[in-house]
């Protein structure tokens, strides 16, 4: 008898409180990098009814109007109506940013490898901004080489935002969540969607019947291929019956609380570090991107159907302390060969990653909602498949 299993992932919209915080943090990062590409930034944000607090550590000579960046970001998301309890022009903005600790800066600005070494490699100059472990993942379930549950979850909330911003569904408000359960067969291949959960904020006059029908017809059926839906697929749409109060009025939000949404929906392991508000010297962010870059190129090269890459670092040290690749029995070559090839082809020192992926640019605000990985709507360097041939050659 064949054994089938279920796996579930979720996503949240750009109007979710935690995602508002992520987007503000990354908008501040982008604004600083646009003026000072060498800046070190760790910007955290907290949002709640009528108030935004921005705090953290920054080293830069650039001036950025934090108040304006915060308000513009909130307006772009769609919080422009005071009835929402959180509005771009009326919210209180409270910045509290200080300079990066000199104890941390000395290890980032001069890595262990170059201290007292006159013949230094410029890419050894930057040490990791902290210790930690980071994961990257890819699987051949979708065109973008992402797990199907998180890919569909992201597309559902993005579709809701499109319908809200275009005015096609006029009663929608910015806050929303999605969740998709996919059934896998005995070969670990997705065969159908078992359950879809969507909760979307709405104006008080919208009826449950109207919301239910619109979400099924204009969101679910537009996003999920019909081949994955059948008469046993379950839909739970606004299952509480009412979702008028939402966003920061309904729940406080913090930067870095949606790290599973940001990555692989729980399908792969996670090192625990968040991304938003951090410049690329923070390996929580840059090494996670590098690990995805490696994993995606491995799968695209046909060297595995599924690949997970772990990188680990010591603070103030440029070279990773470990590189581990797991192909879960799907690899066509030994994992040790892939690890050796990855070290040869991908420069995994922080400065090497920054150069390889061109990470000093203001590109981060666009990643802070709807996932950092598997994006086909924007051009992200860690999603490129330009190392496929090099990997194939390296493992011959």
Curated annotation (Swiss-Prot):
It is an enzyme of class 2 (transferase). It is found in: Cytoplasm. ATP binds at residues 16, 175-177, 242-243, 251, 257-258, 274, 278. It holds the Pfam family S-AdoMet_synt_M. SUPFAM superfamilies: S-adenosylmethionine synthetase (SSF55973). GO terms for molecular function: ATP binding; magnesium ion binding; methionine adenosyltransferase activity. L-methionine binds at residues 57, 100, 251, 282. This is S-adenosylmethionine synthase. Transmembrane segments: none annotated. Binds 2 divalent ions per subunit. Binds 1 potassium ion per subunit. PROSITE patterns: ADOMET_SYNTHASE_1, ADOMET_SYNTHASE_2. Keywords: ATP-binding, Cytoplasm, Magnesium, Metal-binding, Nucleotide-binding, One-carbon metabolism, Potassium, Transferase. Mg(2+) binds at residue 18. Pathway: Amino-acid biosynthesis; S-adenosyl-L-methionine biosynthesis; S-adenosyl-L-methionine from L-methionine: step 1/1. Its cofactor is Mg(2+); K(+). K(+) binds at residue 44. Residues 100-110 are annotated as: Flexible loop. It catalyses: L-methionine + ATP + H2O = S-adenosyl-L-methionine + phosphate + diphosphate. Signal peptide: none annotated. Homotetramer; dimer of dimers. Its EC number is 2.5.1.6. Catalyzes the formation of S-adenosylmethionine (AdoMet) from methionine and ATP. The overall synthetic reaction is composed of two sequential steps, AdoMet formation and the subsequent tripolyphosphate hydrolysis which occurs prior to release of AdoMet from the enzyme. It comes from the Bacteria. GO terms for cellular component: cytoplasm. GO terms for biological process: one-carbon metabolic process; S-adenosylmethionine biosynthetic process. Belongs to the AdoMet synthase family.
């Amino acid at each position: 008898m064949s054994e089938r299993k279920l796996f579930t992932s979720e996503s949240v919209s750009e109007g979710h409180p935690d995602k508002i915080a992520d987007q503000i943090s990354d908008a501040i990062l982008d604004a600083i990098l646009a003026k000072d590409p060498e800046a070190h930034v760790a910007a955290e944000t907290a949002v709640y009814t009528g108030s935004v607090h921005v705090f953290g550590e920054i080293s830069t000579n650039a001036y950025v109007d934090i108040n304006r960046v915060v308000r513009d970001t909130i307006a772009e998301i769609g919080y422009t109506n005071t009835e929402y309890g959180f509005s771009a022009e009326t919210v209180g903005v409270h910045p509290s940013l200080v300079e990066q600790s000199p104890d941390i800066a000395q290890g980032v600005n001069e890595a262990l490898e170059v201290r007292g070494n006159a013949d230094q490699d410029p890419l050894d100059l930057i040490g990791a901004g902290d210790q930690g472990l980071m994961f990257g993942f890819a699987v051949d379930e979708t065109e973008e080489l992402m797990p199907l549950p998180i890919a569909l979850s992201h597309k559902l909330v993005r579709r809701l935002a499109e319908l809200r911003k275009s005015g096609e569904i006029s009663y929608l408000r910015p806050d929303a969540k999605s969740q998709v359960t996919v059934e896998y067969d005995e070969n670990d291949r997705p065969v159908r969607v078992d359950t879809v959960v969507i909760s979307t904020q709405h104006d008080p006059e919208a009826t449950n019947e109207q919301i239910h029908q619109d979400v099924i017809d204009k969101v679910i059926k537009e996003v999920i291929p019909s081949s994955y839906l059948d008469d046993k697929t379950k839909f739970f749409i606004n299952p509480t019956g009412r979702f008028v109060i939402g966003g920061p009025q309904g729940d406080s939000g913090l930067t870095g609380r949606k790290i599973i949404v940001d990555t692989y929906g729980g399908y792969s392991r996670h090192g625990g570090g968040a991304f938003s508000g951090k410049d690329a010297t923070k390996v929580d962010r840059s090494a996670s991107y590098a690990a995805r870059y490696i994993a995606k190129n491995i799968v695209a090269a046909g060297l595995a159907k599924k690949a997970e890459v772990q990188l680990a670092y010591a603070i103030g040290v440029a070279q990773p302390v470990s590189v581990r690749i797991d192909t879960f029995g799907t690899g066509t070559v030994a994992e040790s060969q892939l690890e050796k090839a990855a070290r040869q082809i991908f420069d995994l020192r922080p400065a090497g990653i920054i150069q390889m992926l061109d990470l000093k640019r203001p590109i981060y605000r666009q990643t802070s909602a709807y996932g950092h990985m598997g994006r086909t709507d924007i051009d992200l360097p860690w999603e490129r498949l330009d190392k496929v041939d090099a990997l194939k050659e390296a493992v011959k």
